[in-house]
Each structure stands twice: as structure tokens, then as C-alpha cells.
Regions:
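Mature-chain termini and adjacent capping regions
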Residues: 1-222
Length: 222
């Protein structure tokens, strides 16, 4: 039955009235296509909450659409919210994230990642020490050794801080020390651009003047 949950462990307790329990020692939770593994699983059926905790290994959570690893995994099924703590990894249908801590609201598609993090949201690939990213409105704030790549446009930004507003086609990069750098690939060659503040990279790229090779050859002949 699709609504039936099964939990296995070496020891633990479960209150049938409150639908709450702790399952300790090689605990496993099974429900349909969902599998969870941890040292300890805490289950609250009334609130539809599952918490996985492990000391030496990472807890594991698998479903049709989600894969999550971390020492502690908190999943609020009712609100579709994941909180992953310590050595965290999450992969969904379109996103892949690593970091020390990950908060992900599936309904609003908001990420908050702390610790050195990598977020893949094609064609965007973002690395930073901390990152807030709202996919639904294409808004992101990244801080600390930021590398923000657009794999489709073959561009990259290296900065201490980046603010991104995708719907406005706006991006601002700044540094605490030194200057941020923008790179773009042009016919196999890489263009490097540094400035105190970099803004609106797509506009900058469109204004790049490509050399007219034929005109240069004609000038040499004359």
C-alpha cells in the first residue's frame, strides 16, 4: 500500500496514538519508492517529519525526485523542505548542491547554502563560501571566493561578492581586496577583464568589437 511506512532498527520505540518514534541502530525507513538510512531515525507521522542522524557515516535519503546525504537530514514532507547539516549533498530533478549546510524549499525553489558550496542550475554553475539562490525569480547572492560560471555563454566571474538578478539581466561583482575578474571565451581565446566593480556582463559581452580580419588584410596590401 502506497501509504504504508516501514521502519527497521536495532532498538527504539513508537507511540501508535501519536505516531511518533525513535529508531536507533542501523535504522531504515521505507515508504513506496522512498528509502532512508541513518544511525537514528526520528519519525513524526502527525506532522509528517522525518529526521535522520548519523555520527560516523552520512545519513542517506532517496526518493523518485530527491537524493540527499548529510550527517543530519531533516525532511518536512508536508511543506517539502529539506535541511541538511554537516557534509551535505542534495540532487533534485534540475539542481545539484554541495555544502556544509543546505536549506532547500522545493515549493519556492529557494536554496541557502553555507560552507564552501557548489550549486549547479544549468547553465549556471556557482561556487561560493555562502550562497542564497532563489531559482523561481532567478535571484542570487554569493559571498566568499565566488566563481560564477555560465556554461552556455562561456563566461565566468571571479569575485568576493556577486549579486545576480536574472530577470533583469543584471549582475554586480565586487571585491574586498583587489578587483573582480570577468572572463569570456571568444573563438577559443579567453578575454580577461578586471575593474573595481563589474556590472551587467551580458551587455559588456555584446559590446565587444570583433576584429575584421579581411579589412586588416586589405589595409596591409594598401
Amino acid at each position: 500500500h502506497k501509504d504504508t511506512s516501514q521502519i527497521y532498527s536495532e532498538r527504539g520505540w513508537f507511540d501508535l496514538d501519536d505516531k511518533k518514534g525513535d529508531f536507533i541502530g542501523n535504522a531504515q525507513y521505507l515508504e513506496g519508492n522512498t528509502i532512508a538510512k541513518a544511525d537514528t531515525i526520528t519519525y513524526d507521522g502527525g506532522l509528517d517529519l522525518v529526521t535522520l542522524k548519523s555520527d560516523t557515516i552520512r545519513s542517506e535519503y532517496y526518493s523518485e525526485k530527491d537524493t540527499a546525504f548529510a550527517k543530519t537530514i531533516f525532511y518536512d514532507k508536508k511543506n517539502d523542505v529539506f535541511r541538511l547539516t554537516t557534509d551535505a549533498y542534495y540532487k533534485g530533478e534540475k539542481n545539484e548542491v554541495t555544502g556544509e549546510k543546505i536549506y532547500f524549499d522545493k515549493k519556492t525553489e529557494k536554496f541557502n547554502v553555507t560552507g564552501r558550496s557548489v550549486v549547479s542550475d544549468a547553465p549556471m554553475l556557482i561556487e561560493a563560501d555562502t550562497l542564497d539562490y532563489d531559482k523561481s525569480i532567478k535571484f542570487g547572492i554569493a559571498n566568499g571566493h565566488v566563481i560564477w560560471r555560465d556554461t552556455a555563454a562561456k563566461t565566468a566571474i571571479y569575485a568576493d561578492h556577486v549579486v545576480y538578478k536574472g530577470e533583469e539581466n543584471y549582475m554586480k561583482a565586487t571585491n574586498d581586496v583587489g578587483r573582480p575578474m570577468f572572463t569570456t571565451d571568444i573563438e577559443g581565446d579567453t578575454l580577461y577583464l578586471k575593474a573595481d566593480t563589474l556590472k551587467s556582463f551580458r551587455i559588456i559581452k555584446e559590446r565587444i568589437i570583433y576584429p575584421d580580419k579581411n579589412a586588416a588584410r586589405r589595409a596591409k596590401k594598401n
